[in-house]
């Protein structure tokens, strides 16, 4: 008697979610996953199948129709999404990132994305990471459960060999898509699957399970390193885009690197090379107190100001010259630069004259604001407020009829200040 693909423990775990979003490519893995979930009564009403159309193959539309028909047959809600991504470099990675970005956008609180990755996929992932010279994080490969967006990601088949999925599909007479690109060995994973793994399995039949078990050991090591990082630098618990430097100076370099990795992962930043970590330690952490060095990689910057490290992403570097706030008081968003401002009623604050022209600008130099009965240079105020120099350019400035009326989060010009709660607004920077 074969074991069920979905254990009672997994059923209980998945049952707690409000919605189960199934990544449904139409291939063997996701077809079996969807059928298993649809055949589990406690989970059926939570299911939503999502098919990502990458538009790479000429068969893409036929595959989408196949997936839609199967969902219709099973009575499961279905969404198809065509995605755009950069095809000039690593197509596999770009497609994967675009796919996960869309999945993440669908997830709300207490939702779960369920994917059909199995034990053979895990073994391949470990080997690919090994060949790239990955550390513990990379060799930990895929986790059964992890956070994604506002929800969770689950891989209930991660301990199941592909042959068990094939057996299930045959018994239930399931039809699935065979993507012709899966045979193309120019892709690293396909080369590993078709050329390398057969040789390893010939010599060691249980090698996929052994490799997968190594990933589990690395996941435990990764968790232990995260505990150590927090012990070494308690500021990590509350750190966002800045991190206190002083606790790091008494640590060995390897432990400083461990803290930095935890901090960058917390900010969803791709980790740099070992050489870059060495540069951050030598050139920034142990720099002179008055120095303001920068280390960059992949449109990411780490900088220093006084006693903190600061992390800047690409969307924090490239800012527009001005944004008209035409729908005030509705929130203002500018995704390309990660800008989101909202206006809330206040007891005292910014007064917006009737028919005023409201515009958001950013510091270029020479700005002045009439504040506390004086005309003050913005540069001087930023120094008094101890705002890091590179962050000063990101502070939104509210201009009303071409006059600087508000430095968001810091000051409102006397010319536009009111204590009348019927007229007062507070501008909140949600970026």
From Swiss-Prot:
One GO molecular-function entry: ATP binding
One Pfam family recorded for the sequence: ATP_bind_3
GO terms under cellular component: cytoplasm
Alphabetically ordered keywords of this record: ATP-binding, Cytoplasm, Ligase, Nucleotide-binding, tRNA processing
Subcellular location: Cytoplasm
Chain sites annotated for binding ATP: 25-30
UniProt superkingdom: Bacteria
UniProt free text on domains: The N-terminal region contains the highly conserved SGGXDS motif, predicted to be a P-loop motif involved in ATP binding.
Name of the protein in its database record: tRNA(Ile)-lysidine synthase
Upper classification of the organism: Bacteria, Pseudomonadati, Pseudomonadota, Gammaproteobacteria, Legionellales
């Amino acid at each position: 008697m074969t074991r069920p693909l979905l254990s009672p423990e997994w059923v209980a775990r998945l049952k707690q979610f409000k919605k189960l979003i199934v990544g449904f490519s139409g291939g063997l893995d996701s077809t079996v996953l969807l059928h298993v979930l649809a055949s589990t009564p406690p989970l059926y009403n939570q299911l939503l199948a999502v098919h990502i159309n990458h538009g790479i193959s000429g068969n893409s539309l036929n595959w989408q129709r196949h997936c839609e028909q199967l969902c219709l047959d099973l009575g499961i809600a279905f969404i198809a999404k065509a995605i755009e991504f950069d095809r000039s470099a690593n197509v596999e990675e770009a497609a994967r990132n675009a796919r996960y970005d869309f999945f993440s956008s669908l997830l709300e609180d207490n939702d779960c994305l369920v994917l059909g990755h199995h034990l053979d996929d895990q073994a391949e992932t470990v080997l690919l990471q090994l060949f790239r010279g990955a550390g513990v994080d990379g060799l930990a490969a895929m986790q059964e459960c992890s956070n994604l967006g506002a929800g969770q990601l689950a891989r209930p088949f991660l301990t199941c060999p592909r042959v068990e999925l094939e057996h299930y599909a045959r018994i239930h007479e399931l039809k699935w898509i065979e993507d012709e690109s899966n045979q193309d060995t120019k892709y690293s994973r396909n080369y590993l699957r078709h050329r390398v793994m057969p040789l390893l399995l010939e010599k060691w039949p249980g090698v996929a399970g052994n490799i997968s078990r190594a990933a589990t050991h690395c996941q435990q090591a990764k968790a232990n390193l995260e505990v150590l990082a927090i012990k070494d630098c308690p500021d990590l618990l509350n750190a966002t885009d800045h991190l206190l430097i002083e606790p790091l100076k008494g640590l060995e370099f390897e432990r400083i690197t461990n803290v930095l990795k935890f901090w960058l992962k917390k900010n969803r930043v791709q980790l740099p090379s070992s050489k870059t970590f060495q540069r951050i330690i030598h050139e920034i952490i142990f720099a002179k107190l008055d120095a303001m060095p920068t280390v960059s990689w992949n449109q990411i910057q780490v900088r220093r100001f006084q006693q903190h490290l600061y992390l800047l992403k690409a969307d924090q570097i490239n800012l527009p010259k001005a944004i008209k706030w035409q729908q005030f008081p509705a929130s203002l968003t500018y995704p390309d630069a990660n800008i989101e401002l909202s206006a809330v009623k206040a007891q005292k604050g910014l007064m917006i004259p009737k028919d005023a022209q409201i515009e958001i600008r950013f510091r270029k130099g020479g700005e002045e604001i009439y504040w506390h009965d004086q005309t003050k240079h913005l540069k001087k105020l930023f120094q008094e407020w101890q705002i890091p120099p590179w962050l000063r350019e990101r502070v939104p400035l509210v201009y009303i009829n071409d006059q600087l009326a508000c430095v968001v989060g810091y000051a409102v010009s006397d010319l536009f200040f009111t204590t009348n709660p019927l007229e007062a607004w507070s501008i909140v920077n949600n970026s």
